[in-house]
């Protein structure tokens, strides 16, 4: 994190703050610097500017307490990909998109769907590595808290399956009210060993905003093509909202196997292929 000109100060006592900074490889003395911070003033939680030039111990501790970093706002919406988030961040903070992508790949095995859609207040001067680790730490805590609240413990394999399903729901549903219905169709088709045949699974990575055509359905041989292969895609296809996660975990109990977009921009659901064909005509 040494290339960052900012540092994050967590909530907590002075002792807890110093312990956190030591864990982040800052050269602080837990007893001596705790006493000095009592004299200088307790750091407020948030981002602080520390500059990249060498600082005396006293200057560093003073900055922790008094030098708030300027922030910029970045909004990451559900249904987007990390590539689009990192493009946005690179432009706003004059950072390297390639470095952001590389730091992400180095830090986590999760290809997509892990970072949390949210409005982030990010400090000017942060490095690519520091920023990626901040986003991942925030995401890890969020997913773990949500899963443990529902199931009592975190099971990574089960969580990954739910996030994959949630990402399909995020792409397919016209609104939050439909999410549990779309979820039911996914589970019902999986249970019957049917192909999902959903366009949203083909909106992965670079194809996030590309219209799905019959030619693409025929020619895309990736495991994301649920017209070609049974089962779920290997990874989530986009970021997911809390509502999509809950819909993936708690699908509505229906017998629906099909849905099609109607004139109102929402979807009409059906149990049989014959009814589905009629809905397509309408």
Label the predicted regions.
Residues 213-249:
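C-terminal amphipathic alpha-helical segment
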